[in-house]
């Protein structure tokens, strides 16, 4: 299996499984074959299956949080929406929750309120919270270091004010993968 191979290749047992952008789950062939199943139910079933594999191999999984928010909001994240408590209660405690946000970083009242709201919503989970910001290199031929520093300042300071000190930075190779990371 994939997990067995990963464990043979790497010493770490902390793996970011991502599982983000899964807001259309259950709407493809599964819908045609088995009928409609609520996304929250499919997600809970999937996390249970993956969790058993993680336990088998001693893996501490990290998953993206947008999949909990997207079914209940018009976008990835919102300044008003909430994840239903019954969804939160079905997230196994072994999972670390990664709140990723590369865009919401304006130092306006609206952005600050949205970021604060999202942190408060993440704290409703009974899981460790991590934050993932972005080093902007995916939007053209040159990295946007100035914006990366600007957004990192906003996100890091916001996380620390809310007691979140497990912070990571991502770079992506899409939409301008020609750009250097530096």
Tell me what each language-model feature is.
Residues 1-8, 12-15, 21, 32-182:
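Substrate-binding groove of N-acetylhexosamine-processing glycoside hydrolases
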Residues 24-29:
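Short acidic/His/Gly/Ser-rich catalytic and metal-binding motifs that mark active-site loops
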